[in-house]
């Protein structure tokens, strides 16, 4: 009874807060970085079927992606190789669509369970395709030469990306490899000891496919990565949009996103034209280390991604307030921390649906 009354009060407070937020958008403070994180990107597979993918982004959506300080995405595909034979679960890229992912603020994560679909030959060709399209990447490397990727070279303190996976060693080597979890952990420790003020973003390809909840392995290693000094930890592999949280007991109040889901995912025809495709927007206060996040909602139509027209400042605060309200009454946040399904227009229906499901 008490919990039902508390929940009713939280919903009323949330609706009232939403109306106040709608009346006055909140501007981002100076010194705050925005990191856009996309899940699995597979520029091949079903995208090559008629009608083939054309433009991946409309001009307004592309402009929004360019406005972020950093745009990260998981490159879940191999390059062409002599063993290339496309099927339902093995994918190889010809590289034709890659120039459309060449954002000046962007970087691809190349440690996952598909980068070695073409063995070392395919991995080498993927690296060549990325470099030819002027896309920075971290993950694949010549054995013994791994280095964190500096995302904002002119900025102090520096921001680095480190990428690894417990599942990307199959088919690797002998020369081209990715980091395993123990190697990734040591890389975080080494970087933190060398640059104590740096911001460390860690991407790991891990999780249980088809499940939005974090796996035991994810939680175990997230705690270890956080203790080693990671500021932000991003997971993808499950193909689901998971929750996100701050590990309050960690030394740097590490932010963790448990599942980035799919983005431009040519591995499944269902993502050709889909009404709910998301990006995670993370804001990092470089002065205080504070972090917040919200989902940005969009859709695909014949593989072209476009964002819905929503007031992002409202969306951000509603999702943050919802997560805190759920914590007050001892319940986990609504799955995915947001809408069940994005809708067109200004997204108010989805915001009210969020409160209804709280």
Give, region by region, the residue ranges found by the protein language model.
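Binuclear metal-dependent hydrolase catalytic cores centered on His/Asp/Glu-rich metal-binding motifs
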Residues: 48-59, 91-92, 150-203, 220, ...
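N-terminal catalytic scaffold of extracellular/periplasmic and nuclease hydrolases
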Residues: 29-120, 126, 137, 200
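Short acidic, glycine-rich surface-loop motifs adjacent to enzyme active sites
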Residues: 68-80, 188-213
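Active-site-proximal segments of metal-dependent phosphoesterases and phosphodiesterases across multiple
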Residues: 82-100, 198-230
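Conserved beta-sheet core of the metallophosphoesterase superfamily
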Residues: 104-107, 216-278
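A short C-terminal boundary segment appended to hydrolase-like catalytic domains
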Residues: 29-32, 42-49, 195, 268-358
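Active-site environment of divalent metal-dependent phosphoester hydrolases
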Residues: 44-46, 79-82, 111-127, 143-149, ...
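Bacterial N-terminal signal peptides
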Residues: 13-23
């Amino acid at each position: 009874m008490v919990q039902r009354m508390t929940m009713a009060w939280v919903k009323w407070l949330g609706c009232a807060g939403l109306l106040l937020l709608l009346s006055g958008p909140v501007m981002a403070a100076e010194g705050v970085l925005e990191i856009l994180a996309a899940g699995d990107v597979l520029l091949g597979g079903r995208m090559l079927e008629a009608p083939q993918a054309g433009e991946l982004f409309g001009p307004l959506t592309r402009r929004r992606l360019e406005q972020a300080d950093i745009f990260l995405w998981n490159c879940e595909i191999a390059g062409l190789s002599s063993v290339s034979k496309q099927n339902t679960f093995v994918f190889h890229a010809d590289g034709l669509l890659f120039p459309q992912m060449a954002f000046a603020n962007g970087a691809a994560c190349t440690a996952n369970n598909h980068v070695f679909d073409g063995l070392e030959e395919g991995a080498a060709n993927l690296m060549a395709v990325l470099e030819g399209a002027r896309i920075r990447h971290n993950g694949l490397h010549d054995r013994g030469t791994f280095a964190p990727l500096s995302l904002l070279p002119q900025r102090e303190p520096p921001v680095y990306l480190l990428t690894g996976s417990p599942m990307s060693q199959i088919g690797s080597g002998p020369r081209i490899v990715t980091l395993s979890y123990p190697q990734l952990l040591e890389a975080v420790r080494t970087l933190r000891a060398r640059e104590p003020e740096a911001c460390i973003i860690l991407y790991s390809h891990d999780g249980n496919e088809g499940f939005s909840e974090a796996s035991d392995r994810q939680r175990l290693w997230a705690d270890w990565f956080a203790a080693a000094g990671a500021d932000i930890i991003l997971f993808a592999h499950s193909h689901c949009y998971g929750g996100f949280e701050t590990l309050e007991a960690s030394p740097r109040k590490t932010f963790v996103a448990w599942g980035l889901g799919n983005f431009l995912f040519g591995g499944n025809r269902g993502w050709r034209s889909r009404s709910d495709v998301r990006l995670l927007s993370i804001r990092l206060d470089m002065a205080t280390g504070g972090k917040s996040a919200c989902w940005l909602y969009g859709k695909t139509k014949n593989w072209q991604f476009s964002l819905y027209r929503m007031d992002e400042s409202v969306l951000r605060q509603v999702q943050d307030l919802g997560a805190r309200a759920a914590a007050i009454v001892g319940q986990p946040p609504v799955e995915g921390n947001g809408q069940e399904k994005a809708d067109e227009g200004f997204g108010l229906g989805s915001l009210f649906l969020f409160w209804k499901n709280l």
